[in-house]
A protein has these predicted regions:
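Extracellular jelly-roll beta-sandwich "head" domains, especially the C-terminal globular C1q domain
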Residues: 16-168
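Short, low-complexity N-terminal tether/leader segments at secretion or assembly junctions of large
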Residues: 1-17, 164
């Protein structure tokens, strides 16, 4: 267990392990996803980025250390025509899918207007591995759908990408 590594000396010296680097990024603008098209999700609003591990122009997390990190992401989608029947949210590591969440309805007669998906996973990585989040939406009418954000500093973080170091 990790707790056995915290000693009396480390507590009295004030030197405790920290779970940084870490970051939290959210969507800063609405994003359109075309029907049945794998799309990289754009999280350009860095709420915090301790250690400079997130690039808000490539939307990539590169840990900068070898070890383990906890990674999570959330996606909230909207289709005004209420025609979603599939929503996928994926985590890619070095351009290969490693996590897949899928919400599918068995009949095209069963559709929704709004859909939320998320994942939370602990991964082992090298310092130069990189992670990205992708999504795929399917609609009955083959139309595009939106990933919507709020406005200003009061925006709700429905669309986000987050990671922090796991202390071992």
């Amino acid at each position: 267990m990790a707790i056995d590594k915290i000693t009396t000396a480390s507590i009295t010296s004030g030197v405790l392990p920290v779970n940084t680097p870490c970051f939290f990024a959210s969507s800063s603008a609405d994003q359109t996803i075309n029907n049945n098209t794998t799309t990289k999700l754009t999280f350009s609003n860095e709420v915090y980025d301790v250690g400079g591990v997130y690039n808000n122009s490539t939307y990539r997390f590169t840990p900068g250390f070898s070890g383990k990190s906890n990674i999570s992401a959330g996606l909230w989608t909207y289709d005004a025509q209420s025609s979603f029947f599939r929503v996928d949210l994926w985590l890619y590591k070095n351009n290969s899918m490693i996590v897949s969440t899928q919400q599918r309805y068995t009949s095209s007669n069963t559709t929704v207007e709004r859909q939320s998906s998320s994942f939370n996973v602990t991964v082992q990585h090298d310092a130069d591995d990189y992670y990205e989040v992708f999504g795929l939406l399917r609609t009955v009418d083959s139309g595009s759908a939106e990933i919507l954000v709020g406005s200003g500093n009061n925006a709700i973080f429905d669309n986000y990408f987050h990671a922090h170091k796991i202390i071992e």
